[in-house]
Amino acid sequence: MVNVPKTRRTFCKKCGKHQPHKVTQYKKGKDSLYAQGKRRYDRKQSGYGGQTKPIFRKKAKTTKKIVLRLECVEPNCRSKRMLAIKRCKHFELGGDKKRKGQVIQF
């Protein structure tokens, strides 16, 4: 389980110094219908002849690399950058911190 705080003081390229950053998890955007590869694929798929390209079935990984999106909280900056961290099965953003010697509540 990886627990990452919602804010982080780190270097901002635009400000040129360490600033607090808001941390969110990166999500992939919607695929464009008009990208060249998609247009080519749709053109090839249309008409008779079934599936024209091989469908990938050999999945190797069970996890994805976590990518953090850091946004500078300075009002006139707001620059954003990505930061990749290692692979993990469980990722948590801003969960409560683990304390030593605490009794586990169920």
Swiss-Prot record:
GO CC annotations, alphabetized: cytoplasm; cytosol; cytosolic large ribosomal subunit; postsynapse; presynapse; ribosome; synapse
Tell me where it resides.
Cytoplasm
State the taxonomy lineage. Eukaryota, Metazoa, Chordata, Craniata, Vertebrata
Per its UniProt record, what InterPro entries does this chain match?
Ribosomal_eL44 (IPR000552), Ribosomal_LSU_eL42 (IPR053708), Ribosomal_zn-bd (IPR011332)
Q: Family per UniProt?
A: Belongs to the eukaryotic ribosomal protein eL42 family.
The record's SUPFAM superfamilies line, in alphabetical order, gives: Zn-binding ribosomal proteins
- TM regions (residue ranges): none
Query: Oligomeric state and partners?
Result: Component of the large ribosomal subunit.
Q: What is this protein's name? A: Large ribosomal subunit protein eL42
